[in-house]
C-alpha cells in the first residue's frame, strides 16, 4: 500500500518503512507523529483520490532526527547603487520513517506524540508559547531567556564596523548583539570562532573570513 501526503507545502509518495527528509514538524526523536493531509491512497491498481484529501486517511511516522539543512546563500546586488547583500539560511528539517498508512479514521498502533502534524508552521507556533511558559515558571519575562552572546564585548567605544566592505548597519547590529564590536576582535577570530558564527548567524564562512582579513588591515 502507498499514500501521497502533503506536508511543508510539498507532496511525497510514501509506503511503510520509507525514510523521508521533510520540513520541520513537531516531535521528539522516537515519537510517532500523525500526518493527516493524505491526497491519495492505493494498493495495486486500486487507487483512491481525495478531494482534496482522502477522508479518514492518515499516515503515522516515527521521528528519526531533527536538524537543519545546508546553508543557502542569497546574494542581492543593486546595479549603479554599490549595494550588495548576502544572507544565509538553513532550513529546519525532520527525518521521519513511515510506520503505517491508516484508513477509515483508524488510530496508529503506537501512541501519537501530539495532534496530527502537517507542517513546520505548527512547530513555529509552539516555540513562543513554550518560551513564555518556561519564563513564567522561572519568574522571568520571555526577553530574559535570550541566549548569551557568543563573545564578550570589550570595554570602551565600539568601532564602526560598517567601514569593512560587506558589513552594513544591519550586519553590524547583529555582530554587536553577539559581542563583536571592534576591528581587533574580528581580526583575532580563529577558524573555530568562525565556525561558531557560521552556525549561529546568517553569514557564510567565506564572508566572515573576508571580514577578518579586512579587519587586520584596518586594525594596523
Swiss-Prot record:
SUPFAM superfamilies: L21p-like (SSF141091). GO terms for molecular function: rRNA binding; structural constituent of ribosome. GO terms for cellular component: cytoplasm; ribonucleoprotein complex; ribosome. One of its GO terms (biological process) is translation. The keyword Phosphoprotein does not apply. Coiled coil: none annotated. The keyword Ribosomal protein applies. It comes from the Bacteria. Residues 109-158 are annotated as: Disordered. Keywords: Ribonucleoprotein, Ribosomal protein, RNA-binding, rRNA-binding. Residues 118-146 have a biased composition (Basic and acidic residues). Part of the 50S ribosomal subunit. Contacts protein L20. PANTHER family: 50S RIBOSOMAL PROTEIN L21, LARGE RIBOSOMAL SUBUNIT PROTEIN BL21M. Belongs to the bacterial ribosomal protein bL21 family. This protein binds to 23S rRNA in the presence of protein L20. This is Large ribosomal subunit protein bL21. The gene is rplU.
Amino acid at each position: 500500500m502507498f499514500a501521497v501526503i502533503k506536508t511543508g507545502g510539498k507532496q511525497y509518495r510514501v509506503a511503510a518503512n520509507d525514510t523521508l527528509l521533510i520540513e520541520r514538524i513537531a516531535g521528539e526523536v522516537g515519537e510517532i507523529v500523525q500526518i493527516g493531509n493524505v491526497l491519495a491512497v492505493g494498493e495495486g491498481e486500486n487507487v483512491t483520490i481525495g478531494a482534496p484529501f482522502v477522508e479518514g486517511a492518515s499516515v503515522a511516522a516515527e521521528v528519526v532526527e531533527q536538524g537543519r539543512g545546508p546553508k543557502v546563500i542569497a546574494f542581492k546586488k543593486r546595479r549603479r547603487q554599490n549595494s550588495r547583500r548576502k544572507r544565509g539560511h538553513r532550513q529546519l528539517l525532520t527525518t521521519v520513517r513511515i510506520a503505517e498508512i491508516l484508513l477509515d479514521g483508524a488510530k496508529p498502533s503506537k501512541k501519537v506524540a501530539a495532534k496530527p502534524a502537517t507542517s513546520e508552521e505548527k512547530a513555529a507556533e509552539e516555540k513562543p508559547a513554550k518560551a513564555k511558559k518556561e519564563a513564567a515558571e522561572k519568574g522571568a519575562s520571555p526577553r530574559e531567556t535570550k541566549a548569551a552572546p557568543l563573545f564578550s564585548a570589550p570595554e570602551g567605544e565600539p568601532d564602526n564596523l560598517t567601514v569593512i566592505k560587506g558589513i552594513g548597519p544591519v550586519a553590524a547590529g547583529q555582530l554587536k548583539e553577539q559581542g563583536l564590536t571592534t576591528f581587533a576582535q574580528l581580526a583575532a577570530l580563529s577558524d573555530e570562532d568562525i565556525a561558531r558564527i557560521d552556525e549561529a548567524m546568517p553569514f557564510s564562512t567565506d564572508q566572515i573570513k573576508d571580514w577578518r582579513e579586512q579587519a587586520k588591515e584596518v586594525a594596523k
